[in-house]
């Protein structure tokens, strides 16, 4: 098998196998070929991973942030040196085109290790509070053992986005990737230990929906960070609440992308395509509700149709390929069902709408699809599809589109395209979302916070803000004189 790892799990600095666990077959989405066979973690494996993390964490926390940071920066360097290898693995794991993974996946993970490795001494500083002759100070302290639960759209990136702030803050982590994409996180663990990370601090275990509760409910776990769907987030948050664990939730979205009639239409079309078709539409922050002002709707759709139909669908390992398969057969079937629902409910099919005929074999392909004349009550305008399906809705004025854009249970992200920057800032101020873009879309450098509101989750990934979610404040009051007691 072309991507078989040394073993299913990485615990305490080494690969570990336990064949008693349920078999997990990793399939290459372009062909359906089995490329690796692993085993889900048994309760014994879960205990082994958490115990290793618990043992290793105190000594790691006692190191200076600068010393911890040096290791993370070495890991970033190794990831960049091995970018091609890691990118090809990510393509095999997810089906995303190599032209994407080579610029967006391992590199963004390396960015996270480099950023947190370099800025932590400043980000973890406390404060000094003068109180007359007395004073107080605060310091940030680690939480302990953190659990990261990843999604299947950006497996390597997510492992790094969670691992980097957790580790630099002095924590240990047990990371569980999605069973659909089990391979990348193992390589991240291997690289971290090659960079000098002490044993037990970053452990990877495989599993499915039965494994998560073993991690979330474990008494030695202090924090859970999940990237996943809203239903999964609700279950995890409810379980974590029972023992008052710290929680970060990065969940789904049905985000609005608003195009005003003064926008640069070519840029707006490009932004809409990036916000719907990148990674075959499997991006939580996608702007899948594209609101276009009526005066430019026809021209917008004309340009969008031409560019969408020109996209090259094919073998993800071919660098010319622009759109690859869905991650799994089940996800492809789900997306096809939504496309049929859009047709049945009266939306106008502009482009795509089915399975491409230029690919052969058992791959999980879907054409990039555009619907126009979509109304707010249609299923494709309300529910997260997580595939390459764009809904174009029209609008008359600013107040109307803001009201409609906010009429969603989700609040992850949104975007505005307009030449009027005063209007752009006015609109984003009123949009109910955690991450917003003006005249661009879906750019998420590690320097900026990323996260949502409403049913799209809470807490933030990336930037110095992430350190607040992997540490807590300790306050110390220092008395400088005799105690004045009334007793």
From Swiss-Prot:
It is an enzyme of class 1 (oxidoreductase). The modification Cysteine sulfenic acid (-SOH) is found at residue 284. Disulfide bonds: none annotated. It comes from the Bacteria. It catalyses: betaine aldehyde + NAD(+) + H2O = glycine betaine + NADH + 2 H(+). Pfam families: Aldedh. The keyword Lipid metabolism does not apply. K(+) 1 binds at residues 26, 93. Keywords: Metal-binding, NAD, NADP, Oxidation, Oxidoreductase, Potassium. K(+) 2 binds at residues 244, 454, 457. One of its GO terms (molecular function) is metal ion binding. Pathway: Amine and polyamine biosynthesis; betaine biosynthesis via choline pathway; betaine from betaine aldehyde: step 1/1. Its cofactor is K(+). GO terms for biological process: glycine betaine biosynthetic process from choline. The active site is at residues 162, 250, 284, 461. Binds 2 potassium ions per subunit. Its EC number is 1.2.1.8. NAD(+) binds at residues 150-152, 176-179, 229-232, 252, 284, 384. Signal peptide: none annotated. PANTHER family: ALDEHYDE DEHYDROGENASE-RELATED. Belongs to the aldehyde dehydrogenase family. Involved in the biosynthesis of the osmoprotectant glycine betaine. Catalyzes the irreversible oxidation of betaine aldehyde to the corresponding acid. Dimer of dimers. This is Betaine aldehyde dehydrogenase.
């Amino acid at each position: 098998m072309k991507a078989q790892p040394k073993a299913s799990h990485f615990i305490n600095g080494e690969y570990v196998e336990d064949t008693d666990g349920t078999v997990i077959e990793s399939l290459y989405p372009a062909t359906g070929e089995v490329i690796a066979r692993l085993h889900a973690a048994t309760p014994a494996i879960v205990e082994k991973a958490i115990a290793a993390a618990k043992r290793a964490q105190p000594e790691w926390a006692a190191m200076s942030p600068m010393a911890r940071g040096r290791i993370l920066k070495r890991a970033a360097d190794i990831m960049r040196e091995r970018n091609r290898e890691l990118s090809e693995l990510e393509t095999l794991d997810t089906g995303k085109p190599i032209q994407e993974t080579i610029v967006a996946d391992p590199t963004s993970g390396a960015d996270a290790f480099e950023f947190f490795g370099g800025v932590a001494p400043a980000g973890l500083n406390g404060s000094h509070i003068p109180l007359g002759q007395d004073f107080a100070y605060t310091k940030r302290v680690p939480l302990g053992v953190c659990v990261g639960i990843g999604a299947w759209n950006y497996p390597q990136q997510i492992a790094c986005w969670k691992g980097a702030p957790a580790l630099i803050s002095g924590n240990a982590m047990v990371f569980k990737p999605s069973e659909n994409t089990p391979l990348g996180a193992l390589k991240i663990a291997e690289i971290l230990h090659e960079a000098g990370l002490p044993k037990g601090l970053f452990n990877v275990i495989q599993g499915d929906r039965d494994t998560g509760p073993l991690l979330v409910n474990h008494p030695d776990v202090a924090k859970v960070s999940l990237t996943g769907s809203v239903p999964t987030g609700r279950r995890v948050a409810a379980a974590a609440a029972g023992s008052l664990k710290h929680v970060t939730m990065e969940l789904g979205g049905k985000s609005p992308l608003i195009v005003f009639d003064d926008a640069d239409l070519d840029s707006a079309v490009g932004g809409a395509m990036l916000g719907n078709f990148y990674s075959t539409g499997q991006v939580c922050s996608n702007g899948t509700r594209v609101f276009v002002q009526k005066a430019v709707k026809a021209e917008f759709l004309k340009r969008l149709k031409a560019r969408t139909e020109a996209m090259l669908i094919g073998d993800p390992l071919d660098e010319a390929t622009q759109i690859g398969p869905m991650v799994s057969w089940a996800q492809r079937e789900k997306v096809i069902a939504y496309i049929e629902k859009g047709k049945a409910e009266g939306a106008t099919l502009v482009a795509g709408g089915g399975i491409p005929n230029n690919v052969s074999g058992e791959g999980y392909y879907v054409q990039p699809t555009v619907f126009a004349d979509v109304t707010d009550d249609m299923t494709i305008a309300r529910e997260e599809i997580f595939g390459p399906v764009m809904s174009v809705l029209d609008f008359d004025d600013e107040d109307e589109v803001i009201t409609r854009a906010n009429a969603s249970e989700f609040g992850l992200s949104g975007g505005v395209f307009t030449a009027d920057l005063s209007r752009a800032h006015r609109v984003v101020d009123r949009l109910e979302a955690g991450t917003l873009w003006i005249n661009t879309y879906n750019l998420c450098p590690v320097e900026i916070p990323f996260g949502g509101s409403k049913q799209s989750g809470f807490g933030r990934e990336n930037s110095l803000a992430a350190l607040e979610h992997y540490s807590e404040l300790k306050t110390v009051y220092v008395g400088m004189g005799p105690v004045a007691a009334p007793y």
